[in-house]
């Protein structure tokens, strides 16, 4: 750590503020920034700020895609975790940069909650070395967990390169036949209660699972409460 990075632990600062705190010239400041790989610059003109990257488990950048109404995924942004803890810089596909003190607002609905969220948390806790209590997960824990989430996303968001690759290579699921629903639903309900299957990030406390099944009006993705 250096004096520069120590100052940035509290959050983004402008060049004039940093130069004043460090009592250095513009030339010296430029050299300091050039030597610090984790110091990033964002904004334009007088709105330019400097921030300190905060890699999480070796990850500095988390790409995000948005799935449109036609089922096509489009690159939306890159998220870079920064200091202070929980904050991030989001660079849109159009180059627009925005600072967030927590999860970007459009991803907050993806935070695990309710019955399925707890089941998902228990399933991933041992794998990711996280606490089983999803209420104790920090912002970076949630983002990291979302990169390995293999269910269906609320709002059509794909977080992480791995999920994008799974999306574009996924095969269309086979619908549960009408005459086999009872057997399949009993097993899915049992698995859901055991925390072994999570097909959605839907919230709520009532036990439930999601699946793709035949219905009188055609094959549909359904949310089954029991």
Which sequence ranges carry the predicted segments?
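Phosphate/dinucleotide-binding and metal-coordinating scaffold of catalytic cores
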Residues: 2, 8-226
């Amino acid at each position: 750590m250096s004096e520069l990075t120590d100052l940035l632990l509290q959050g983004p600062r402008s060049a004039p503020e940093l130069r004043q705190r460090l009592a250095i010239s513009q030339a010296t400041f430029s050299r300091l920034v050039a030597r610090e790989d984790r110091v990033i610059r964002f904004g334009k003109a007088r709105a330019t700020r400097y921030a300190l990257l905060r890699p999480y488990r070796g990850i500095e950048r988390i790409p995000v895609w948005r799935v449109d109404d036609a089922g096509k995924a489009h690159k939306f942004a890159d998220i870079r975790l920064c200091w202070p803890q929980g904050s991030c810089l989001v660079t849109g596909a159009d180059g627009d940069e925005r600072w967030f003190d927590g999860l970007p607002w459009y991803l907050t609905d993806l935070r695990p909650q309710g019955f399925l969220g707890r089941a998902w948390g228990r399933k991933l806790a041992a794998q990711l070395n996280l606490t089983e209590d999803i209420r104790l997960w920090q912002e970076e824990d949630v983002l990291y967990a979302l990169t390995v989430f293999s269910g269906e996303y609320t709002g059509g968001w794909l977080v992480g390169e791995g999920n994008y690759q799974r999306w574009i290579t996924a095969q269309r699921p086979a619908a549960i036949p009408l005459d086999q629903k009872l057997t399949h639903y009993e097993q899915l309900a049992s698995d859901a209660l055991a925390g072994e299957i999570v097909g959605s990030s839907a919230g709520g406390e009532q036990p439930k699972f999601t699946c793709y099944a035949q219905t009188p009006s055609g094959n549909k993705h359904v949310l089954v409460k029991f």
